[in-house]
């Protein structure tokens, strides 16, 4: 029998498991769905299907994919488990068999050699495929309508990396997808693999290189001519794994390395810039101005997850606050330094943009924001996954426009839908799941980006609660 400790901070509030597979036809709607919204809003959520082990972490739950399917003003909802070999093994045993996060030395002997990924972090759509991905393994292909699992996906044998980022980048001009694999030859390796995939699913470029030290890597940045790889001091260690300790340790004395690689370059061509110890989970966008690379991203002083640190200091939440920041890398400089500028002080994460304008100087970005002037319905452990507001960042005004979700509500990562294929940048709608914590259920809100603070133009009402998701995407029917 599954049991979940409601006093566990990682199982509280928006993060309490729901474990619901559902197929809900014709959802209730308040307001009117804009005509532009025809397609699917995909999401991926970590959900523990069985009782968690004492040392569990939220980000290690099984993948539970979901989709809101929009057609002609009507909305249907579906959610399905991502049926990985790990999921199937634990379902058969009716108990947890896999141990600490990304540490195979803590697993039950019966699952030795089984793919450990839970494919729980993002949904990727490209070359007609819908993929559930997590960075510790290859993605799993899903049926675009039913979300039933079709199997592990290696691009028909073209991707030999053991791992695949949950945050590939897309070139709106060429239709290419760019991706990397970190610890690409296994958890204990420094190897990085980098691929470019054309719009038809063919790998057109591949190269490999080594990290300066073994590190947790979640996201990267791409411009027209460059790919940028941030290596930050959340380090991994074979010795720690064998000692059955957490895989990562925060080692600020190592500093950070920022690798800049020509977009179709070879691993030997990478140039390393340096920065102090810092952490970046998510990149907004990157572009070039002459010989400079500019990157907007969410930067914090330390890794926001409480892994051990080399100074044996307690976890400090005040240093784990992600803030919108701009990096500037001068490729003509004679040194390895870069410039970093904080753009705003508010806690903000899960950024997206109008991806039609990716890889160029953009004006708008969209994200979850904790407005300090408003009450929070969520707790410390839920930060990064839930927010009291949704925000539009304007690079011209250098400020946010915010919509407050409500005293007992919390928003999740948004998705952007343009008003029309040729609409100006940022002219469209934001979609976000909002947890109504006092009602134990969720809504999907639709906000007009031209008047965000006015509130939803339509609300899709679910009869149950959705757990805090990690990432999703919008896929138009066209």
UniProtKB/Swiss-Prot annotation:
Inhibited by HgCl(2), AgNO(3), CuCl(2), phenylhydrazine, 8-hydroxyquinoline, R-cycloserine and p-chloromercuribenzoic acid. Coiled coil: none annotated. Keywords: Iron, Metal-binding, Monooxygenase, Oxidoreductase. Fe cation binds at residues 167, 218, 282, 471. It comes from the Bacteria. The keyword DNA-binding does not apply. InterPro entries: Carotenoid_Oase (IPR004294). Optimum pH is 9.0. GO terms for biological process: carotene catabolic process. It catalyses: (E)-isoeugenol + O2 = vanillin + acetaldehyde. Its EC number is 1.13.11.88. GO terms for molecular function: carotenoid dioxygenase activity; metal ion binding; monooxygenase activity. Optimum temperature is 30 degrees Celsius. 1 Fe(2+) ion per subunit. Its cofactor is Fe(2+). Monomer. Belongs to the carotenoid oxygenase family. Involved in isoeugenol degradation. Catalyzes the oxidative cleavage of the side chain double-bond of isoeugenol to form vanillin and acetaldehyde. This is Isoeugenol monooxygenase. It comes from Pseudomonas putida (Arthrobacter siderocapsulatus). The gene is iso.
């Amino acid at each position: 029998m599954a049991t979940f400790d409601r006093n566990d901070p990682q199982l509280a509030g928006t993060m309490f498991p729901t474990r619901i597979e559902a197929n809900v036809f014709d959802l209730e709607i308040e307001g009117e769905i804009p005509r532009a919204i025809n397609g699917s809003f995909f999401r991926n959520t970590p959900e523990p299907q069985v009782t968690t082990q004492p040392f569990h972490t939220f980000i290690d739950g099984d993948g539970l994919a979901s989709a809101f399917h929009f057609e002609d003003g009507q909305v249907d909802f579906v959610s399905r488990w991502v049926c990985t070999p790990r999921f199937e093994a634990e379902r058969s045993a009716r108990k947890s068999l896999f141990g600490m996060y990304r540490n195979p030395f803590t697993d039950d002997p019966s699952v030795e050699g089984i793919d450990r990924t839970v494919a729980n972090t993002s949904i990727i759509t490209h070359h007609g495929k819908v993929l559930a991905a997590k960075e510790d393994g290859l993605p799993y292909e899903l049926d675009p309508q039913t979300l039933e699992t079709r199997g592990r996906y290696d691009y028909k044998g073209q991707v030999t990396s053991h791992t695949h980022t949950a945050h590939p980048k897309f070139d709106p001009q060429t239709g290419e997808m760019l991706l990397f694999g970190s610890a690409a030859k296994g958890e204990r390796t420094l190897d990085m693999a980098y691929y470019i995939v054309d719009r038809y699913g063919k790998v057109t470029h591949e190269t490999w290189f080594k990290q300066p030290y073994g590190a947790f890597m979640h996201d990267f940045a791409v411009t027209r001519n460059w790919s940028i790889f941030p290596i930050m001091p959340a380090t991994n260690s074979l010795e720690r794994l064998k000692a059955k300790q957490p895989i990562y340790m925060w080692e600020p004395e190592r500093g950070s390395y920022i690798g800049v690689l020509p977009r179709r370059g070879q691993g030997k061509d990478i140039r390393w810039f340096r920065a102090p110890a810092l952490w970046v989970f998510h990149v907004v966008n990157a572009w070039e101005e002459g010989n400079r690379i500019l990157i907007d991203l969410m930067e914090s002083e330390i890794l926001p997850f409480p892994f051990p640190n080399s100074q044996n200091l307690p976890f400090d939440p005040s240093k784990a606050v992600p803030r919108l920041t701009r990096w500037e890398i001068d490729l003509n400089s004679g040194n390895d330094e870069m410039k970093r500028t904080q753009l705003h002080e508010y806690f903000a994460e899960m950024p997206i943009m109008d991806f039609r304008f990716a890889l160029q100087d953009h004006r708008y970005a969209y994200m979850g924001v904790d407005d300090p002037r408003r009450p929070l319905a969520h707790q410390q452990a839920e930060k990064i996954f839930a927010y009291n507001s949704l925000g539009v960042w304007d690079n011209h005004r250098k400020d946010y426009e915010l919509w407050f979700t409500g005293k007992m509500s919390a928003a999740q990562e948004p998705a952007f839908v343009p008003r029309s294929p040729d609409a100006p940048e940022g002219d469209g709608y934001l979609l976000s799941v909002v947890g109504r914590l006092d009602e134990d259920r969720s809504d999907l809100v639709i906000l007009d980006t031209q008047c965000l603070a006015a509130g939803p133009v339509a609300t899709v009402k679910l009869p149950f609660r959705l757990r805090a998701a990690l990432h999703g995407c919008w896929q138009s029917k066209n």
